[in-house]
């Protein structure tokens, strides 16, 4: 049927689904035109798939139940940039095979909508499309927008410690019912602006809209990475090691040296996570998860508060272990004399260097220690 009607045809060596524009041997053109009229109505409101199927069942069309879903799927493929499918009122940016299987059995659960954007609204879509590097049509833009936010970690979706605009944009996208309404009405309202009407384009309004939207989206995108850095610096500060990546590397070096000598059953697993992980990032994620008893990407605001409370407890244990650890304990009497002489020599050299920043001194010593460790590692 699809080939005979011309809906599926070969174009330049490739088979494609195309819209019908002239009479065909199968008499599908009137059906296609009725589907176009039904789906591309005067409003953006979705219309019932069951209602569409009932309409096409009746004279003068008389399309059988088995053919109806096939025609609908072809129609949505041909007009994929201008149509949307809904399941129980929820937008399906990218319908799956499972969705279509349900539609075959329960068409009453689904609705469909279509729109052709022109005028000022088209300029808005084109601006989105340039930023997302996608086709200048509503559905491709909305798909990228929703996919980007849905891919963010659980923490970003659950925290309320973000700006008002970021919270509103997140909720608006999550509850989107219509792609057209999302772009031209719901998102502007979420950003405390008037909806975009299909009339003369107000460039200042457009710039303000995208400035607020981009700020909110950037904040959402950066929220979980920000949390990781915050957790790292909270822990380091409590341990008296400063802040930043260099200080974290210093902590990991200390953990390697300290772990074999620690007996505190609560602190030891934390030190082992820092000492035995493959890299600094993995070690950091593992340590934060241990302190809060949950991976940081899944933290709620309550988990963040729990982490803050526990940090001081673990840091106190760390400082006590560090203070009680005597590196010379494993050395012979002769080795102790040698190590003290070297330490005194280094102390005098550092005094001559007149280093006033303790952070610089710690990092320098850490680098030297790492080089010495690397030199004595067995070569494979």
Question: What is each stretch, according to the model?
Answer:
Residues 64-70, 82-89, 100-108, 154-160, ...:
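Short, charged low-complexity intrinsically disordered segments located at boundaries
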Residues 84-131:
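C-terminal engagement modules used by replication, chromatin/transcription, nuclear envelope/ESCRT
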């Amino acid at each position: 049927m699809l080939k005979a009607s011309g809906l599926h045809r070969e174009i330049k060596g490739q088979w494609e689904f195309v819209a019908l524009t002239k009479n065909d041997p199968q008499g599908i053109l009137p059906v296609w035109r009725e589907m176009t009229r039904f789906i591309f109505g005067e409003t953006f409101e979705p219309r019932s798939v069951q209602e569409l199927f009932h309409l096409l069942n009746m004279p003068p069309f008389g399309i059988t139940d088995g053919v109806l879903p096939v025609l609908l799927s072809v129609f949505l493929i041909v007009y994929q940039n201008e149509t949307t499918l809904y399941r129980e009122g929820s937008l399906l940016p990218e319908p799956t095979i499972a969705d279509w299987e349900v539609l075959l059995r329960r068409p009453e659960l689904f609705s469909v909508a279509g729109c052709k954007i022109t005028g000022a609204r088209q300029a808005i879509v084109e601006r989105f499309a340039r930023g997302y590097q996608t086709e200048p049509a509503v559905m491709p833009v909305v798909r990228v927008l929703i996919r980007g936010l849905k891919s963010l970690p659980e923490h970003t979706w659950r925290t309320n410690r973000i700006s008002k605009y970021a919270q509103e944009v997140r909720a608006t996208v999550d509850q989107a019912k219509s792609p057209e309404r999302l772009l031209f009405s719901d998102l502007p309202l979420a950003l405390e602006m008037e909806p975009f009407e299909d009339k003369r384009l107000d460039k200042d309004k457009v710039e303000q809209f995208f400035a607020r939207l981009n700020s909110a989206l950037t904040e959402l995108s950066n929220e979980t990475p920000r949390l990781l850095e915050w957790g790292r610096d909270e822990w380091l500060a409590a341990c008296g090691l400063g802040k930043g990546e260099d200080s974290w590397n210093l902590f990991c070096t200390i953990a390697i040296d300290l772990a074999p000598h620690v007996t505190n059953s609560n602190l030891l697993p934390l030190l082992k996570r820092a000492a035995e992980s493959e890299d600094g990032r993995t070690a950091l994620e593992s340590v934060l998860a241990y302190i809060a008893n949950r991976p940081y990407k899944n933290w709620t605001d309550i988990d963040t508060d729990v982490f803050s409370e526990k940090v001081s407890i673990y840091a106190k244990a760390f400082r006590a272990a560090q203070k009680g650890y005597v590196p010379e304990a494993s050395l012979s009497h002769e080795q102790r004399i040698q190590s003290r002489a070297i330490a005194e020599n280094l102390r005098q050299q550092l005094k001559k260097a007149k280093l006033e920043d303790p952070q610089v001194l710690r990092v320098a010593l850490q680098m030297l220690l790492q080089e010495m460790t690397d030199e004595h590692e067995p070569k494979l």
